[in-house]
């Protein structure tokens, strides 16, 4: 994420995780990698450059992992093939991977698109029901 800061993108990060995570690190890497890659791609097209912004919020509460990635986007630009990426063949595989991880962890995913802001929210649930009491509060 450091290159984003040096490139002038406003970056807000709020990550509050325990030392011992109850979720596989591989799954977290896939989630963050794909969601941030999509946010970076969309934000790069925003003009003027001063309006470029990405947010990342992540915390674990009562055994549920809450993740939110938001970014500004240019709502006027809709690419012909649904992507600006050069690898159009593999386009969409990242989001499918994210959806599979959400399904595997009995989670929920919802997207909030607004005029110039896009936000994706994910909650993954731990299999330990005792930890889930009181969950459901948003980030």
Language-model segments: what does each one mean?
Residues 12-31:
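Conserved short strand/loop->alpha-helix "switch" segment adjacent to the catalytic nucleotide/phosphoryl-transfer site
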Residues 40-48:
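A short, flexible helix-to-loop-to-beta junction within the catalytic ATP-binding CA
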Residues 63-92, 131-138:
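Glycine-rich/acidic phosphate-handling loop/turn and adjacent ATP-lid/helix
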Residues 106-116:
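Glycine-rich ATP-binding loops of the HATPase_c
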């Amino acid at each position: 994420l450091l290159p984003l800061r040096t490139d002038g993108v406003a970056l807000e990060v709020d990550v509050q995780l325990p030392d011992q995570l109850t979720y596989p690190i591989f799954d977290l890497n896939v989630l963050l990698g794909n969601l941030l890659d999509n946010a970076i791609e969309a934000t790069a097209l925003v003009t003027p450059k001063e309006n470029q912004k990405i947010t990342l919020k992540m915390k674990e509460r009562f055994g549920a992992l809450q993740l939110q990635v938001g970014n500004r986007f240019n709502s006027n630009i809709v690419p012909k093939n649904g992507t600006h990426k050069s690898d159009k063949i593999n386009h969409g595989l990242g989001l499918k991977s994210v959806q599979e991880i959400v399904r595997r962890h009995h989670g929920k995913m919802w997207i909030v698109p607004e005029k110039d802001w896009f936000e994706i929210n994910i909650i993954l649930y731990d299999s330990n029901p005792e930890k889930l009491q009181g969950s459901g509060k948003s980030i």
